[in-house]
Amino acid sequence: LPPPFWAFAWAGGQGLARYVLDHTESVSGKRVVDFASGSGLVAIAAAKAGAATVLAADIDPWTETAVRMNAGLNGVDIGFTHADLIGRAIEADVLLAGDVFYDRAFADLLVPWFINLTDRGVSVLVGDPGRAYLPKQRLEALATYQVTVSRALEDSEVKKTTVWRFL
């Protein structure tokens, strides 16, 4: 089996979760999708911050069990889907995506989708620690955090992580 990279609290997800908890107005009372949810860290933060509904979305077959267990341990209700949402319209007010710009081909799929969602009125928030394929346009920096990370995953113990809003 490949390593469960989705199980780690990546810097982008940690920064995005912190932002949501610090700025509850970004999700409070809103329908939220946590895209590429992994273990559910950002989805849990959204639920704790008062989101009306939270849907965790991840195509990895192992993630659903982790999300459901972590949600239960945190006393929050989170829906889950394995559907590949890329390119599709979503029933949400906010899409959260932590640390998704690590691969060129993936970024090339995400950027037009995120722009399309934004143009349809969805607030797209992304947490990113300076990955190579983060787009350089149509972004507004909302907050920056110094995030402690695992040396098993990163080249340093702390990563500067920015939360961006697609414009």
Task: For each feature predicted by the language model, list its residue ranges.
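S-adenosylmethionine-dependent methyltransferases
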Residues: 1-167
